[in-house]
């Protein structure tokens, strides 16, 4: 495990060697901000029916699982290991719950069908306004539906990946890039190139929001402050960008 201060070393020793409950509680409190962070990012665009308190509970289960299974002797930061466990626990919990109502699923299918129809008609990407006009919906309703539908697709993709893994996915995901097989590196580089090409098809503002959110790790509110736009407007831009990228993500795991 990478260098720790003396206090943390004592906590980890008491927890791993003696299973001291107080040390476990102290470590849970110490790393709780990780749970808050991942809940904040995953909850972006989720339906209002999904409560953050429920996500926090799932994330805390993931954090405890990480404390139970982490090996401090490895040259690995606990934050890195715990992040995968926390995110995985939240995604698994969402996938097991029918968090997207049937009416929302039907609406998502209608929007996706309209997009396919309009893109065939105009031979280009279509805007939420054009989709709204086609379906007799408001633009905001279309954007919200796109957002919910995209997250449902992500859960589906995550489930396919989960079904294909060998139980060691976390170890694989956090291994040293130097040990990646050449053929896997080629595939990874090709995927990055495809994503980069697709991202370049986004509008300048969409590219900026995606970069600030995923690379710089700003919140939607912080991005709004940078661009002098409301949080709801940034959320709309973010939703549109992700919707445009989802087809590529789906093709990658087929």
Swiss-Prot record:
This is RNA polymerase sigma-D factor. Residues 220-239 bind DNA. It comes from Bacillus subtilis (strain 168). Keywords: DNA-binding, Sigma factor, Transcription, Transcription regulation. Belongs to the sigma-70 factor family. SUPFAM superfamilies: Sigma2 domain of RNA polymerase sigma factors, Sigma3 and sigma4 domains of RNA polymerase sigma factors. NCBIfam families: FliA_WhiG (TIGR02479), PRK06986.1 (NF005413), PRK07670.1 (NF005809), sigma70-ECF (TIGR02937). Monomer. Interacts transiently with the RNAP core. One of its GO terms (molecular function) is DNA binding. It holds the Pfam family Sigma70_r2. Induction: Association with RNAP core increases during H(2)O(2), NaOH, rifampicin stress and during sporulation (at protein level). One of its GO terms (biological process) is regulation of DNA-templated transcription. Signal peptide: none annotated. Sigma factors are initiation factors that promote the attachment of RNA polymerase (RNAP) to specific initiation sites and are then released. This alternative sigma factor is required for the transcription of the flagellin and motility genes as well as for wild-type chemotaxis. Associates with the RNAP core during all growth phases with a peak at the transition to stationary phase. It comes from the Bacteria. InterPro entries: RNA_pol_sigma-70_dom, RNA_pol_sigma70, RNA_pol_sigma70_r2, RNA_pol_sigma70_r3, RNA_pol_sigma70_r4, RNA_pol_sigma_FliA_WhiG, RNA_pol_sigma_r2, RNA_pol_sigma_r3/r4-like. The lineage of its organism: Bacteria, Bacillati, Bacillota, Bacilli, Bacillales. A motif (Polymerase core binding) lies at residues 54-67.
């Amino acid at each position: 495990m990478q260098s720790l201060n003396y206090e943390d070393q004592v906590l980890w020793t008491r927890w791993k060697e003696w299973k001291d409950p107080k040390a476990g509680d102290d470590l849970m409190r110490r790393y709780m901000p990780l749970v808050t962070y991942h809940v904040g990012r995953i909850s972006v665009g989720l339906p209002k029916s999904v409560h953050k308190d429920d996500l926090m509970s799932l994330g805390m289960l993931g954090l405890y699982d990480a404390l139970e299974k982490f090996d401090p002797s490895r040259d690995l930061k606990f934050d890195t290991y715990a992040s995968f466990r926390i995110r995985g626990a939240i995604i698994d919990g969402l996938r097991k719950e029918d968090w997207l109502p049937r009416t929302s699923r039907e609406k998502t299918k209608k929007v996706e069908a309209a997009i396919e129809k309009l893109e065939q008609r105009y031979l280009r990407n279509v805007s939420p306004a054009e989709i709204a006009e086609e379906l007799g919906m408001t633009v905001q309703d279309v954007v919200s539906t796109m957002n919910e539908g995209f997250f449902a697709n992500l859960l589906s993709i995550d489930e396919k990946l989960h079904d294909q893994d060998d139980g060691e996915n976390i170890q694989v995901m956090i291994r040293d890039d130097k040990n990646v097989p050449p053929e896997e590196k080629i595939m990874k580089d090709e995927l990055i190139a495809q994503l980069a090409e697709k991202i370049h098809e986004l509008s300048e503002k969409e590219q900026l929001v995606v970069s600030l959110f995923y690379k710089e790790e700003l919140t939607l509110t912080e991005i709004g402050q940078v661009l002098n736009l409301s949080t709801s407007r940034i959320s709309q831009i973010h939703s549109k960008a992700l919707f445009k990228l989802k087809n590529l993500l789906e093709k990658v795991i087929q």
